């Protein structure tokens, strides 16, 4: 029997600059969305937007033991929260429905039948133990992997295996020559002949593997650019060979262009694990990252707008993003830098927008109810501008302004605030109370003038120490939003009540 060759792709149709860009994001619904996964989605989405192309969102859910609907819903929630939208895919539909692999099994069976008929795939009956035994008998390392033994079984051998009740896996026949492709990020890459054995595409129970369904879906959906993590680089020669075969049998129209994005490293120069708390997208959201800040930072994990420009908008990202500019070197996830960039984007928010984004965090801290009262609305409107310039994460807001929402008798004084109090605390508080009691116009300027006169001028306390006891009495903290403005929000009666309560 003459087996077909898929080694020569020189004359195969290729993606050109004129080919409309079609990229995809195709996660498995396992676990919680993590930084590396979202960076991949972001780069695909940005490239589609930059080129006026199409972003396809499909789900690879052929592993029933690991996949879950909860993870699927989390993927949808993650992309929607970040504002990463898709033209085709789950929930949206499109010309290549369905977009969940578990609903496309009949399509894969048809393709497998064509691959078998054309000789690009074959049945393999060897068990792992038999493969190892053959390696040992030949003096080879038993862990070398599959030895291509079943490539050309006779009809009699196949019949004998079937008589034993064996169910075959299906393997793709790898060419006996180098496999070379050009990576958008890494340039030309070659895998030497013989370095990759014939590989399984269908399990013995008939269920398809990622090695089959991923390139088949790319072919059927007309994907032009495969942009994914570096961890999948080693699987690319297998996919190149399979796509060549798919072109030969009329399933694929062209070979997509591959681009492998750099690893994201965590602490200690180790690859950032999806189980690392810093990698968990929803934990980052819970801490108070906003989409604008997080997208900006994730863009920097392998790409940059310019050498001296770390802060940019999503619109600027779309305008300038090109996969060819992505660096091959590993990118390090620096949580401190991420927080700083997030803080810059918080300061860029419109005041009303910022105020509205604080509400879920205040609600989570039980400072406000499901519906804000008129007084809570008033406090938030006046307090938000005091902290917008001072926080890097929305999650820092509740602790910073919680004292404004509490009853006067519910202020807990932090330990570090107590430690800095002067020995003549009672005297200082009495002077402050007397000075404030006399203030008729309850404004920040009047409050500051009265306290400065009583504590700095009259008592001789250094300015940087003078107002600490008042701050602690009013807020319970050593550090708070601007003191005098906070006292205006509380009102005269509440401010004095807190000073009296703290004095005891």
Swiss-Prot record:
GO terms for biological process: glutamyl-tRNA aminoacylation. GO terms for molecular function: ATP binding; glutamate-tRNA ligase activity; tRNA binding; zinc ion binding. It is found in: Cytoplasm. The keyword Magnesium does not apply. It holds the Pfam family Anticodon_2. ATP binds at residue 274. Its EC number is 6.1.1.17. InterPro entries: aa-tRNA-synth_I_cd-bd, aa-tRNA-synth_I_codon-bd_sub2, aa_tRNA-synth_I_cd-bd_sf, Glu-tRNA-ligase_bac/mito, Glu-tRNA-synth_I_codon-bd_sub1, Glu/Gln-tRNA-synth, Glu/Gln-tRNA-synth_Ib_cat-dom, GluQ/Sye. A motif ('HIGH' region) lies at residues 27-37. GO terms for cellular component: cytosol. It catalyses: tRNA(Glu) + L-glutamate + ATP = L-glutamyl-tRNA(Glu) + AMP + diphosphate. Catalyzes the attachment of glutamate to tRNA(Glu) in a two-step reaction: glutamate is first activated by ATP to form Glu-AMP and then transferred to the acceptor end of tRNA(Glu). Belongs to the class-I aminoacyl-tRNA synthetase family. Glutamate--tRNA ligase type 1 subfamily. Monomer. This is Glutamate--tRNA ligase. It comes from Arthrobacter sp. (strain FB24). The lineage of its organism: Bacteria, Bacillati, Actinomycetota, Actinomycetes, Micrococcales.
């Amino acid at each position: 029997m003459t087996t077909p060759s898929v080694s020569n792709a020189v004359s195969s149709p290729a993606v050109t600059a004129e080919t409309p860009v079609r990229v995809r994001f195709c996660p498995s619904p396992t676990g919680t969305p993590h930084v590396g996964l979202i960076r991949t989605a972001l780069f695909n989405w940005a490239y589609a937007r930059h080129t006026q192309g199409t972003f396809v969102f499909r789900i690879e859910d052929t592993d029933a033991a690991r996949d879950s609907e909860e993870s699927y819903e989390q993927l949808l929630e993650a992309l929607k929260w970040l504002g990463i939208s898709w033209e085709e895919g789950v929930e949206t539909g499109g010309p290549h429905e369905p977009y969940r692999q578990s609903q496309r099994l009949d399509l894969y069976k048809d393709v497998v039948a064509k691959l078998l008929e054309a000789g690009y795939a074959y049945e393999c009956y060897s068990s792992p133990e038999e493969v190892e035994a053959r390696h040992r008998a030949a003096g080879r390392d038993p862990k070398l992997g599959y030895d291509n033994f079943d490539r050309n079984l006779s009809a009699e051998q196949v019949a004998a295996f079937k008589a034993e009740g064996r169910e075959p896996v299906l393997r793709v026949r790898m060419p006996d020559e180098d496999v070379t492709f050009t990576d958008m990020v890494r340039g030309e890459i070659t895998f030497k002949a013989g370095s990759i054995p014939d590989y399984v595409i269908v399990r013995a129970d008939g269920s398809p593997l990622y090695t089959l369904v991923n390139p088949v879906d790319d072919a059927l959906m007309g994907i032009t650019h495969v942009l994914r993590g570096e961890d999948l680089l080693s699987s690319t020669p297998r996919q190149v060979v399979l796509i060549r075969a798919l072109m030969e049998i009329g399933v694929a129209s062209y070979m997509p262009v591959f681009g492998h994005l750099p690893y994201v490293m965590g602490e200690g120069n180790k690859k950032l694990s999806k189980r690392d708390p810093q990698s968990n997208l929803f934990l980052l959201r819970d801490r108070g990252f906003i989409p604008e800040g997080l997208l900006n930072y994730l863009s920097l994990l392998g790409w940059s707008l310019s050498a001296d420009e770390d802060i940019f908008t999503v619109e600027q990202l779309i305008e300038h993003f090109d996969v060819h500019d992505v660096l091959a070197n590993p990118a390090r996830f620096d949580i401190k830098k991420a927080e700083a960039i997030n803080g810059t984007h918080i300061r860029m928010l419109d005041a009303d927008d910022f105020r509205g984004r604080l509400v879920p965090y205040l609600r989570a801290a039980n400072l406000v109810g499901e519906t804000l009262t008129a007084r809570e609305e008033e406090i938030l409107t006046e307090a938000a501008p005091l902290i917008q310039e001072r926080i890097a994460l929305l999650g820092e807001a509740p602790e910073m302004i919680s004292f404004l929402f509490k009853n006067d008798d519910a202020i807990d004084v932090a330990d570090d605030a107590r430690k800095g109090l002067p020995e003549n605390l009672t005297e200082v508080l009495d002077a402050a109370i007397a000075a404030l009691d006399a203030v008729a116009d309850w404004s920040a300027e009047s409050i500051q003038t009265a306290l400065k006169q009583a504590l700095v001028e009259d008592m001789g306390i250094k300015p940087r120490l003078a107002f600490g006891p008042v701050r602690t009495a009013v807020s319970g903290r050593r550090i708070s939003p601007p003191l005098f403005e906070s006292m205006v929000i509380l009102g005269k009666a509440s401010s004095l009540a807190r000073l009296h309560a703290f004095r005891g």
